[in-house]
Amino acid sequence: MAVPKKRTSMSKKRIRKNIWKKKTYFSIVQSYSLVKSRSFSSGNEHPKPKGFSGQQTNNKIFE
């Protein structure tokens, strides 16, 4: 015969929720620091897209 589960206490719910929040917070901090270190290692805060040579031509006509 099927028996219903016991109800989880509020304190257990709170503890489990806090553990989950801490894990997500630390993963966000870790990923942010990784992105920050990569952008500073290249010497540019906004890295250039692939295939960008960096040379731009000036198309102004001088009279």
Swiss-Prot record:
- Could you tell me one molecular function GO term of this UniProt entry? structural constituent of ribosome
| Stretches the record annotates as Disordered | 39-63
Do you know which Pfam families this protein is assigned to?
Ribosomal_L32p (PF01783)
Organism domain of life: Eukaryota
What keywords does the record list, in alphabetical order?
Chloroplast, Plastid, Ribonucleoprotein, Ribosomal protein
**BP GO terms, sorted:** translation
Give the lineage: Eukaryota, Viridiplantae, Streptophyta, Embryophyta, Tracheophyta
What GO CC terms are in its UniProt record?
A: chloroplast; large ribosomal subunit
HAMAP family noted in UniProt: Ribosomal_bL32 (MF_00340)
Q: Which organism is it from?
A: Triticum aestivum
Protein name per UniProt? Large ribosomal subunit protein bL32c
Localization recorded for this chain is:
Plastid, Chloroplast
